[in-house]
Amino acid sequence: MYMAFAYASFDGDDAYYVVQSVLADQTGVLNRIRPYTGLSTDLDIRHALATLPLWIAYVARMTGIHATIVAHTLLPLIFIPLTYYVFVQIGRKLFSDGSVKLPIFLTLVSIMQIWGNISIYTNETFFLTRTWQGKSVLANLILLVELWLMLELCAREKNRERQEETGSQLPS
């Protein structure tokens, strides 16, 4: 958390997506100015589907904080704990017997997140160094939430089947 807050890393995507957030916040237009040149542009479908920079601009406008600060400082402080919360929930679903497996699972997840920076393309690298980017939010939060929800649905289905079995075995 401290490293994400104090040592924000910058990469090539910042030249487009963070600048897009700044432009949307400062000019009030969405995807109408090319971030590289500052000139007007037609609507680019590929970049128009990237809505996270516009959400960052919205958060910046509502809070009065510069969009770059929101992206590089505020969002890691929100997304990193939120991701670990989802890991806790997944661990609770996988290891619901109350054993020591949940802390071991979370320790292994943390070790993989910290030491998984073996390439610029791993989700661990995106998680800790590019937290504010849509790719990182997808790989490290949205897909994990979907896994958590699927585990939740499976657990509910098992509970429903157990209730039906015990209900049908009761004497009339």
Model-based region annotation:
Residues 2-133, 137-141:
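Active-site lumenal/periplasmic loops and adjacent helix-entry segments of GT-C-fold
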Residues 143-170:
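Membrane-interface transmembrane helices that cradle and orient dolichyl/undecaprenyl
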Residues 129-133, 167-172:
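Glycine-rich, flexible loop segments associated with nucleotide phosphate handling
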Residues 115-122, 152, 156, 171-172:
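Extended alpha-helical regions
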